[in-house]
Amino acid sequence: ILLAWLVERTAIPARAWIGNLILVPMTVPSLLSAIAWVQLLDPRNGLVNVVLRSLFGLQSDTGPFDIYTLSGMCFVQGLRLVPSAYLMIAASFRAMDPSLEEQSAMAGQNVAQTTLRVTLPIMRPALLAALIYFIIVVIESFDIPGLLGFTARIRVLSTAIYWATHSEVGLPDYGLASALGAIILVVALMLMWGYQRLT
């Protein structure tokens, strides 16, 4: 939201360049992006960790950062979603009439009051649509949780479906995989129902 606001509602220098640079990560496949983060933040031989251990004289063979955690997966997935979020929110800012914010300012409202009383209510449908999109993308995403989560045996919904159909011992459990897939469908339907109620 902040990046979209800066590019669409302020006169910062090179804002067109900033808007284009935000979209560059969309050109990189998510699996390749996850591999790049592994090269940087692998706890044993990631470039950032090796440099930090040598700079600060840390005696540990691992860390200080570990990409193979749930927070690491959230970090990488979150960065992957920034360009999409920017596109959705920036389009909403672009379509909104700036004179509404100007009238609020002329009525004596400060920036925070204008944001809470004018900007956010107008942008609520776009913000909710973006939120629903991101929740569904995160739930169904497999490549980043697969690469980062398999190593640490962290299972999320998408990887749990994979493990149910690729059992290490015995036959695949297609019933469990179907039930887990139905959870994604139920979540998507509930989000759409909530969107209809709130907009």
Name each model feature, range by range.
Residues 61-66, 163-175:
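Membrane-interface segments at the starts/ends of alpha-helical transmembrane spans
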Residues 21, 48-49, 112, 154, ...:
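Amphipathic alpha-helical segments in well-structured domains
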Residues 19-22, 50-57, 98-106, 117, ...:
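Short amphipathic alpha-helical coupling elements at transmembrane boundaries
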Residues 143-170:
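Glycine-rich helix-loop "coupling/hinge" segments at transmembrane-helix boundaries
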Residues 10, 96-123:
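Short helix-to-coil transition segments within interhelical loops
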Residues 1-94, 122-143, 147, 177-196:
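Membrane-water interface segments at the C-terminal ends of transmembrane alpha-helices
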